[in-house]
């Protein structure tokens, strides 16, 4: 699929996509959040959230105004996985160029559309490589697959194909870890609800305040709407997949 199939290619396309997914109200609010960011962030109280028995600090950055969206927890989650991998001298691939916007990293990055130094512009389902990875990590990328493009075919099948492709690139003891928001992509939500995503392990985070997230049981997170009551994601799934047998 060529880049013109991407719904948010170009400035006009990106504005149209943003309004379609998040509403015109967010189009109005976003510039004010960006302008206010350098004033607001220094005064924000440090917060933490629990994940797998430990505490991780929320992450506030001006880029993408992480202090008012799910990146506040997704970036720390991504860094947690990278730290685990670094302790084991693991080979890492990130699918979707996200963490590079918030600091320097030396792992491989694959992104179908975003051009940046060192980023491999390939589709994960067709990428040919002899390399195998201990960890494949993806931050809020899989919900866009088949949903934010004009290519024919259902999103669910494409998401499952991308998961299968990632798992096939893992070393025997490797794992794929992804974060996805609930309530954004209806087909992805149905996969999760029906236990058809195929994850081996999963953890759910629910937003209880503008910058307050808590790990909750599956039934507490399912059905959480996107964009209400707080902007953007109000619940996340962190899913892990093992290498195929």
Task: Put a short name on every predicted segment.
Residues 1-19:
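Boundary detector for helix-to-coil junctions that initiate low-complexity/charged tails
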Residues 20-86:
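Class I SAM-dependent methyltransferase Rossmann-like catalytic core
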Residues 75, 100-102:
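Glycine-rich SAM-binding Motif I of class I
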Residues 137-142, 146:
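A conserved beta-strand element that flanks and buttresses the S-adenosyl-L-methionine
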Residues 65-68, 145-245:
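S-adenosyl-L-methionine-dependent methyltransferase catalytic module, highlighting the catalytic core
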Residues 86-99:
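Conserved class I S-adenosyl-L-methionine
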Residues 102-138, 151, 157-161:
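Adenosine-cofactor binding site in Rossmann-like domains, unifying the SAM/SAH pocket
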Residues 92, 107, 176-178:
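Hydrophobic/aromatic residues located in beta-strands of well-ordered beta-sheets
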